[in-house]
């Protein structure tokens, strides 16, 4: 760069003018910042949030106690106990997930042959105590009942890829 060019850039502050023009350009664009608890951004249909156990339309729980989710969980966060019913089918008597161990990988959801355990759209489940993050079967079924419409819609959208 010649001395004349350097002097011209310094004298006319071309770098400063370029920076200010960029700032003005962004100043008049649409804002992308959200005012988070009052505004919420879109979630991907593949978002993996709080776990839930689903039920059939009849109200019967879907889980058949195959224990595939427990076996595949890399964090060993799932504990299942089951017993056979009179009709020969198996159902869970205990289904616990330690959410402090869970790494939200989604392997349990992928392994489940009947779509019983899913990771729902809820990401706001902060608690004050550790015990509140130890989910039992009842808590998981409540989550499933609460988020069933969104979970079913997300699973239907992803059916081609499963």
Curated annotation (Swiss-Prot):
Which cofactors is this protein said to need? [4Fe-4S] cluster
One GO CC term, this protein: mitochondrion
Q: Which gene encodes it?
A: NAD8
Positions annotated to bind [4Fe-4S] cluster 1: 63, 66, 69, 112
Quote the SUPFAM superfamilies the UniProt record gives.
4Fe-4S ferredoxins
Q: Do the record's keywords include Ribonucleoprotein? A: no
Q: Which GO terms describe its biological process?
A: mitochondrial electron transport, NADH to ubiquinone; mitochondrial respiratory chain complex I assembly
- Give the organism the record lists: Reclinomonas americana
Name of the protein in its database record:
NADH-ubiquinone oxidoreductase subunit 8
- Which compartment or compartments is the protein found in? Mitochondrion
Cofactor binding description: Binds 2 [4Fe-4S] clusters per subunit.
Enzyme Commission number(s): 7.1.1.2
Q: Which PROSITE patterns match?
A: 4FE4S_FER_1 (PS00198), 4FE4S_FER_2 (PS51379)
- Protein family per UniProt: Belongs to the complex I 23 kDa subunit family.
């Amino acid at each position: 760069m010649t001395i004349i060019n350097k002097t011209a850039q310094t004298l006319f502050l071309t770098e400063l003018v370029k920076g200010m023009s960029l700032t003005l350009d962004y100043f008049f664009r649409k804002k992308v910042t959200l005012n988070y608890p009052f505004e919420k951004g879109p979630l991907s249909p593949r978002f993996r949030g709080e776990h839930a156990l689903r039920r059939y339309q009849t109200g019967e729980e879907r889980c058949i106690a195959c224990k595939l989710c427990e076996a595949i969980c890399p964090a060993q966060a799932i504990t299942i106990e089951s017993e056979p019913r009179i009709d020969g089918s198996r159902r869970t008597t205990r289904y616990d997930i330690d959410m402090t161990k869970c790494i939200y990988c989604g392997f349990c959801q992928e392994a489940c042959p009947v779509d019983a355990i899913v990771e729902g759209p809820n990401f706001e489940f902060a608690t004050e105590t550790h015990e509140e993050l130890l989910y039992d079967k009842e808590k998981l079924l409540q989550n499933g009942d609460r988020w069933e419409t969104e979970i079913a819609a997300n699973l239907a959208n992803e059916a081609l890829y499963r």
